[in-house]
């Protein structure tokens, strides 16, 4: 597993404890109570490091190569999954995976953005950057869910919509705008979870829902830290400053009324314990579905409409107000 800079001290300590345990099998260098003390110290070290992460370090966790992807969540959460492909206009976009899913006996339409897990699959999935046909595919499946009375789960994980010439020629902006318009009035419950990167319109095109949640170390922003740094300072070394200024993580966005919930990750991030992460996301989805399933359609749509009409809280100082 690839090590992030802030993880090195923890891994070295874990290796030391593992070495002691191995040597103990032959020589009994340390008693079990002494080993336990070392493990307790390791727990305190982890708590100290992971409770004081900078926004940029959390972005690195969010982008970790071993972080679970949409396909992993499908395997970890669903008893059944039948994939559906194509947008019925141009082609299938592998950056979107969607289909009929069964979770704890309840049927859903699960639609997620997929980056891939190695060089070959990442190139095949275009690194999770959707083309117009990806947004059209997602909307086609969402409308199918509405037709069959199925709740929808959107899993968001993209560095942004594909910015290439071919995507623009096929109507990238139009495809995203159409999704915003159509999903806002879809007559079935929609639950959105940002599981990794949630960047710009590429994320928003699949993030219109009745509830929007984020994993603890995921981010949701109008631009990546690198993009922000290149525009504001023209200096890639300012990525860390940009990540802090963008307020792109769950606790800030919940305070701004942009997301509704932050789902806790295992210590160190989802890649350290994927199974526990699948369980947390599954619990959240089922819990929210129970709240939404009996709402009259008119009330469901009105609440969704008002949610996005009033999204975001901000304050103005009394000084600026008086000047105005």
From Swiss-Prot:
Reaction(s) catalysed (UniProt annotation): N(6)-carboxybiotinyl-L-lysyl-[protein] + acetyl-CoA = N(6)-biotinyl-L-lysyl-[protein] + malonyl-CoA
CoA carboxyltransferase C-terminal domain mapped to chain residues: 41-291
Disulphide connectivity of cysteines: none
Pathway noted in the entry: Lipid metabolism; malonyl-CoA biosynthesis; malonyl-CoA from acetyl-CoA: step 1/1
Region forming the signal peptide: none
Compartments where located: Cytoplasm
UniProt KW keywords: ATP-binding, Cytoplasm, Fatty acid biosynthesis, Fatty acid metabolism, Lipid biosynthesis, Lipid metabolism, Nucleotide-binding, Transferase
One GO term (biological process): fatty acid biosynthetic process
GO terms, molecular function: acetyl-CoA carboxylase activity; ATP binding; carboxyl- or carbamoyltransferase activity
GO terms for cellular component: acetyl-CoA carboxylase complex
EC number: 2.1.3.15
Main location: cytoplasm
Family matches, as Pfam families: ACCA
Record family assignment: Belongs to the AccA family.
Function: Component of the acetyl coenzyme A carboxylase (ACC) complex. First, biotin carboxylase catalyzes the carboxylation of biotin on its carrier protein (BCCP) and then the CO(2) group is transferred by the carboxyltransferase to acetyl-CoA to form malonyl-CoA.
Quaternary structure note: Acetyl-CoA carboxylase is a heterohexamer composed of biotin carboxyl carrier protein (AccB), biotin carboxylase (AccC) and two subunits each of ACCase subunit alpha (AccA) and ACCase subunit beta (AccD).
Protein name in the entry: Acetyl-coenzyme A carboxylase carboxyl transferase subunit alpha
């Amino acid at each position: 597993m690839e090590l992030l800079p802030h993880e090195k001290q923890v891994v070295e300590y874990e290796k030391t404890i593992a070495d002691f345990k191995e040597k103990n099998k032959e020589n009994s260098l340390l008693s079990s109570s002494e080993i336990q003390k070392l493990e307790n110290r390791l727990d305190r070290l982890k708590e100290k490091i992971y409770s004081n992460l900078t926004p940029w370090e959390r972005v690195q966790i969010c982008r970790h190569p071993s972080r679970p992807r949409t396909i992993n969540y499908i395997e970890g959460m669903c008893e059944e999954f039948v994939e559906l492909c194509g947008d019925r206009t141009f082609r299938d976009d592998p950056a979107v995976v969607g289909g009929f899913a069964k979770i704890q006996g309840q049927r859903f339409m699960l639609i997620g953005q997929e980056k891939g897990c190695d060089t070959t699959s990442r190139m095949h999935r275009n690194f999770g950057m959707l083309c117009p046909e990806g947004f059209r595919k997602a909307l086609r499946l969402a409308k199918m869910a509405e037709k069959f009375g199925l709740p929808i789960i959107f899993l968001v994980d993209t560095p942004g919509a594909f910015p290439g010439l071919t995507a623009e020629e096929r109507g990238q902006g139009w495809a995203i705008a159409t999704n915003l318009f159509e999903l806002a009035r879809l007559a079935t419950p929609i639950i959105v979870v940002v599981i990794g990167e949630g960047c710009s319109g590429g994320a928003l095109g699949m993030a219109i829902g009745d509830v929007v949640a984020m994993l603890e170390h995921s981010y949701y922003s109008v631009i990546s830290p690198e993009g922000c740094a290149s525009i504001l300072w023209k200096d890639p070394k300012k990525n860390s400053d940009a990540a802090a200024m963008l307020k792109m993580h769950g606790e800030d966005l919940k305070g701004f009324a942009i997301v509704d919930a932050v789902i806790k990750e295992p210590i160190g991030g989802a890649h350290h314990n994927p199974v526990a992460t699948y369980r947390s996301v599954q619990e959240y989805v089922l819990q929210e579905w129970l709240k939404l399933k009996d709402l009259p359609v008119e009330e469901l749509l009105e609440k969704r409409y008002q949610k996005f009409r009033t999204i975001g809280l901000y304050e103005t100082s009394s000084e600026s107000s008086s000047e105005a």
